[in-house]
Regions:
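Active-site acid/base region of carbohydrate-active enzymes
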Residues: 2-15, 71, 78-92, 131-193, ...
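Catalytic cores of carbohydrate-active enzymes
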Residues: 3-8, 20-25, 94, 156-167, ...
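Aromatic (Trp/Tyr) and acidic
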Residues: 183-190, 197, 254-308, 334, ...
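Composition- and surface-driven signal marking solvent-exposed, interaction-prone regions
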Residues: 77-80, 212, 218-222, 298-299, ...
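Acidic/polar, glycine-enriched structural segments that form the non-catalytic walls/loops
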Residues: 1-45, 137-139, 148-153, 210-212, ...
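Aromatic-rich carbohydrate-recognition surfaces in CAZymes
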Residues: 45-80, 84-170, 193-196, 200, ...
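Short hydrophobic/aromatic segments of transmembrane alpha-helices and their interfaces
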Residues: 37-38, 123, 144, 182, ...
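Carbohydrate-binding/catalytic loop surfaces
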Residues: 25-45, 94-118, 163-188, 242-280, ...
Length: 421
């Protein structure tokens, strides 16, 4: 049965992957990728930040499987270049672009005090992945200073001085829409383990790009910044008691040396752990900055059926959390427990990275079973699913990171999978 679903999914993804590509239109001067097929209820016309990055991971696998290297390069590179075209002088990059405009909530630019979220830190990662695949950085070389401004904007305007951790400005367009560690929380109060894991890899990716063009001093500087961030994550986000990484609460009142109250013993901590069991707690394994001992403890947590381990993958929120909720929703999409292709894939990649092949195989097979059953029954895939019975919950026709099961299938069959940076 599993082999039949593998073949079914391979054929479907290889045939339909080109439906995620779009030609230049309006303000988008370059070809680009979108999350859904034409005509899908959502996401069929817009270029999104981490969605386009994940689409490129899939398209690399399609090109490898069909022996057509570079087939989608113009769309993948164009996605990066479109974002760079719309980067302002301060390095602020939009989260989303359409031919007619972009998704905004408040002003993320200097005029707004850099107080809104911007493109997630996957821009250098996207470029580094495509550069490695192409064997040349010539396509991105002129834009490297722009990527540098983008990263510097994160470091200058989105990082907490006391901890060295990146934080969400608001809960707007954070990717994991209603993650309770950020959703409806005060502005600039959450040092997200998800955001910091992405930023750690972003700094490493930019270092790789700089090395590729021969700028070794700056490459070393960016890698040192990545190491500093990893130290901050291990210091402030790791919980030795629970054996996992959590996001941190930064919303502490400042110490006032002029106020006599508490002067004898003011607080000496810079943050408090937000002990909310969320799938993104496993992202430090994907990022490769967890120690071997930390990874082993997290592996045990990923195996626990009371919390994360479900019949069809990793619950996006532990079943023991009071916020656990499997109802269908859009704006926000629901990350309060449903299984997503993206979370299954990134947890799988973390398990592979630390040599936990049996656990990785089990998660990959669950994902094949989830998507194979849906494709066989409905002729399409959906955005997210019930973790225990595998029933689709929302958005028929969603493609994007669901197609990452193709990369899992390659790994299951002992082929070298296409991977992210």
């Amino acid at each position: 049965m599993l082999e039949r679903w593998e073949r079914l999914l391979e054929q479907h993804i290889r045939t339909n992957s080109e439906l995620m590509t779009r030609e230049p239109a309006g303000q988008l001067a370059h070809p680009y990728t979108v999350p859904s097929a034409p005509g899908a209820a959502h996401y069929s016309t817009a270029l999104w930040d981490w969605d386009s990055w994940s689409a490129s991971i899939v398209l690399g696998q399609v090109a490898a499987d069909t022996d057509r290297p570079g087939e989608f390069a113009v769309y993948e590179q164009g996605s990066v270049l479109n974002f760079l075209d719309h980067t302002d002088d301060d390095g602020v990059v939009p989260i989303q672009l359409t031919p007619d405009g972009s998704l905004t909530h408040s002003d993320p630019s200097r005029a707004g005090g850099f107080s809104e979220n911007m493109h997630k830190p996957v821009l250098a990662q996207h470029a580094a992945m495509l550069t490695k695949r192409a064997g040349s950085a010539d396509w991105i070389r002129p834009s490297l200073p722009t990527i540098g401004r983008f990263i510097d904007r994160y470091l200058e305007s989105h990082v907490h001085a006391g901890t060295g951790l990146a934080y969400w400005q608001t809960d707007f367009a954070i990717g994991v829409d209603n993650d309770p560690s950020a959703f409806y929380r005060p502005a600039q109060s959450t040092a997200s383990v998800y955001l910091n894991s992405l930023l750690y890899r972003e700094l490493q990716a930019y270092g790789s790009l700089l090395e590729e063009v021969g700028d070794l001093p700056q490459a070393g500087r960016r890698r040192n910044q990545a190491a500093d961030l990893a130290d901050a994550m291990r210091t402030h986000l790791w919980d030795e008691r629970d054996g996992t990484f959590y996001s941190a609460d930064l919303a502490l009142r400042p110490v006032d040396d002029e106020d006599w109250l508490h002067r004898g013993a003011p607080r000496r901590w810079q943050s408090l752990l937000l002990r909310i069991d969320n799938w993104s707690s496993f992202l430090p394994m994907w990022a490769g900055m967890a120690t071997a001992e930390q990874a082993e403890r997290m592996r045990q947590r990923a195996r626990d059926p009371r919390t994360f381990a479900a019949a069809y993958g990793i619950r996006s929120l532990s079943r023991l959390e009071k916020m656990y909720d499997l109802r269908a929703s859009n704006n926000p999409s629901n990350w309060l427990g449903p299984v997503w292709g993206m979370s299954n894939y990134l947890v799988f990649r973390g398990l592979v990275k630390y040599g936990f092949d049996d656990d990785a195989r089990g998660l990959a097979e669950k994902t094949v079973r989830l998507f194979g059953r849906d494709l066989e029954a409905s002729g399409a895939l959906h955005e997210y699913y019930h973790p225990d019975n595998g029933e689709p919950i929302m958005t028929k026709g969603f493609q994007n990171w669901n197609f990452l099961v193709l990369n899992m299938i390659a790994w299951l069959n002992q082929r070298v999978p296409a991977t992210e940076f």
